[in-house]
A protein has these predicted regions:
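Active-site phosphate/pyrophosphate-handling residues
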Residues: 27, 58, 148
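Short amphipathic alpha-helical segments with heptad-repeat character
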Residues: 29, 33, 37, 81, ...
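Charged, amphipathic alpha-helical coiled-coil/dimerization segments
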Residues: 92-149
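N-terminal leader segment of winged-helix/HTH proteins
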Residues: 1-50
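C-terminal regulatory/oligomerization modules of transcriptional regulators
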Residues: 1-20, 145-166
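N-terminal helix-turn-helix DNA-binding core of bacterial DNA-binding proteins
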Residues: 23, 41-82
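Short, hydrophobic-biased segments on the C-terminal half of alpha helices
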Residues: 73, 91-92
Length: 166
């Protein structure tokens, strides 16, 4: 018996106790949670082989996409919806690794800018290439139509949760 069979058995038991119990909804929620956890663990393992975590990767890709590969900590924080404290911690780590550097802002002497170093540029390009192959490997398991449906459903659910929390 695999994990989903066990999960279904447990939830089905709840349904036998209460016929009105939302079996499918509970099962879907549990499947989403478990799939998300496995994906996060898988991505963490992949990025860990390169010596970084997902948050550091997101900061690097945000800087890579920025004009002149340079942003202020508050711009990064806003784009990624990370706290300023978290951005500082991540930047400290990336600076020690030699991937970013802090510089004084030309517009405001009190402000700092964070920019990719040449080593950081090379690293993110190499990592992006490896990740491209890795992502294809993960998602090739689903057909193109299944991938599109998965995207539509997830966007719809995310919009629902965003509306519900407003």
């Amino acid at each position: 018996m695999n994990n989903t069979d066990t999960l279904e058995k447990i939830i089905r038991h709840q349904k036998t106790k209460d016929p009105a119990y939302p079996f499918r909804e509970h099962l879907l929620m549990q499947l989403c949670i478990r799939t998300n956890k496995r994906m996060q663990d898988n991505i963490s393992e992949f990025l860990g082989a390169y010596g970084i975590n997902h948050s550091a990767y997101m900061v690097l890709t945000t800087l890579f996409a920025a004009e002149n590969h340079c942003l202020s900590p508050s711009e990064i924080s806003q784009k990624l919806q990370f706290t300023r404290t978290n951005i500082t911690r991540i930047t400290d780590f990336l600076e020690k690794a030699g991937y970013v550097k802090r510089t004084d802002s030309r517009e405001d002497r009190r402000a700092k800018k964070i920019s990719l170093t040449s080593e950081g540029m090379f690293f993110i390009q190499r990592l992006t290439l490896a990740q491209s192959m890795y992502l294809k490997e993960i998602w090739d398991y689903l057909t193109h139509d299944e991938q599109e449906l998965f995207e539509v459903i997830n966007k719809k659910l995310l919009a629902h949760f965003s509306d519900a929390s407003s």
